[in-house]
Amino acid sequence: METAQQLDKPALDTNDAARDKAINEQVTMTQDTPYPDQTVGNPFVDDPKMRLRDVEVFYDDNQAIHGVSLDIGKNEVVSLIGPSGCGKSTFLRCLNRMNDTIDICKVKGSLHLESQDLYDPKLDVVELRARVGMVFQKPNPFPKSIYDNVAYGPRIHGLANKKYDLDEIVETSLRKAGLWEEVKDRLHAPGTGLSGGQQQRLCIARTIAVSPEVVLMDEPCSALDPIATAKIEELISELSESYTIAIVTHSMQQAARVSSRTAYFHLGRLVEMNDTETVFTKPEHDLTEAYITGRFG
């Protein structure tokens, strides 16, 4: 369980030249190519795990997300793609209320995890974040041992009555994260002493240790080398057998490799969502095609 101080904050820095350039390119594109009246493709599924309708996000008076509606299916891997500043990470953080940590942020719309209203005032947000876990862009292991990083959540949520039970949860989580064989003989070593790729897999183990239903990943490989990235991508495929996964990525190649459906965001709007192969080989909207062919972004 991450504290507010340990969370990566959304990119709100207007001095970020690359981000500003990407936003300006998006504005220029929409001057020539208007948004569709509604999202192109197939953003909805039967019997969704998460049902999201007319989602809007504001930072004070600045609207970051404009009326996004989509479904995420059970045990589906969905990729959210788009240029810097398009709102994909902001949208992802709505799904387990990480945006609550930002005082000026306000979320509107209907967001449900099956029948549960995610923004019900009576909802225990800590419990929600156990059901909908998050893996961040930069690995953020706690300053604790490898064992205690994974055991932290189960202890907080009372998932283990005995040390034997806790040991089993830790081992199972590390195995699912593909890390057990690498750390089983040094479980009490600091988690911060692992390599970057190992740290990210430790964070994934920490997330799944509380048995979430959904795992959100915000650019989980952006700070990793190609070998570590390949391990995370293989892990995503394996985890999808047990969990529903939504991943934000700047890498279109990664989206193509790991996801069954892909959603393209542009200046806070969902332009197109469809099965991944269709989005990348036969995009239906000109803005999507312009992005995936490298004309901007």
Swiss-Prot record:
Keywords assigned by UniProt, alphabetized: ATP-binding, Cell inner membrane, Cell membrane, Membrane, Nucleotide-binding, Phosphate transport, Translocase, Transport
Alphabetized InterPro entries for the sequence: AAA+_ATPase, ABC_transporter-like_ATP-bd, ABC_transporter-like_CS, P-loop_NTPase, PstB-like
Gene Ontology MF terms in the entry: ATP binding; ATP hydrolysis activity; ATPase-coupled phosphate ion transmembrane transporter activity
Residues covered by the ABC transporter domain: 50-292
Listed PROSITE patterns: ABC_TRANSPORTER_1, ABC_TRANSPORTER_2, PSTB
The protein's Enzyme Commission number: 7.3.2.1
Pfam annotation, one family: ABC_tran
Residues that hold ATP according to the record: 82-89
Entry GO CC: plasma membrane
Reactions mediated catalytically: phosphate(out) + ATP + H2O = ADP + 2 phosphate(in) + H(+)
The protein's assembly and partners: The complex is composed of two ATP-binding proteins (PstB), two transmembrane proteins (PstC and PstA) and a solute-binding protein (PstS).
Stated family: Belongs to the ABC transporter superfamily. Phosphate importer (TC 3.A.1.7) family.
Protein name as catalogued: Phosphate import ATP-binding protein PstB
Underlying gene: pstB
